Every structure is written in structure tokens, then in C-alpha cells.
């Protein structure tokens, strides 16, 4: 399946899931900004290469270190429930490979992301840069990798 078709299918699955849960989430559909972000950010770029054929399936995928990238519906739902406004800043604990941070950077003014596992944080930095979320230099005495994504830019410590 081509990426465009897989992404469109993923969006349809997310929309159907939101509609199915409309009573629980209090609305018939997720915020269009979140759906746009989900369609814009290439999920296959945030999973290990051997799992890229499954990137748009509505399943969590292993990313190493006994961690997973959440299934697309959960990423969309969590992001929607944050009700992010254009001037909001968001803190993410646990960067993983950067997918959630890339999604959050679409509706938010700034995203702070703290990597729990340094190796994943370094991989996330590279993947986010490839998506145009380049770092803004920042000093930090923290042993953890921290990034700030700001409308197309990111800050790492």
C-alpha cells in the first residue's frame, strides 16, 4: 500500500473510532486540526525501518528498549483531548522516537519533550530534524535529552 493511501486509511480508521466513542468523548469527531496533523506527519518515519510496512495500521509498534509507539487512534485522541490552542506550550515526558512530539508541534506554539531513554532521544532528534523540526540551541545541566519544538523548530538540551 502506498503511503498516501495508507495515511488516508489511517485517518478513516481514526474518524470511525472517534464516531464509535462519541458518547464517551462528547463529540462526533476529533478536532480537524488534529486530523490534519495526523495526516501531515509521516508516521512511517518514526518507526524502525523493518516495521514501516505496518506504520499506518491502528496498532502500537515496538521501538526498542521495551517501548512502543502508540497506535494512531490513541495518539489522535490524546492530542485532541488536550484541546491545544495556538499559543499553548505542551510538555511531553518520554519522547520515544518523536512521533507524538511531531504531532503536538502542529497545533501548539511550543512543545517541550523530555527523553527518558537517551538512545531513543537521539534517534528522535534525527527523525524530528528530518521533518523540519530543527533544534534551537539550549543549555541544560540535565542528563536527560530535552527538546522544544516551536512551529517548525525544536530546542534540544
Could you tell me what each predicted segment is?
Residues 81-157:
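Conserved nucleotide-cofactor-binding alpha/beta core module
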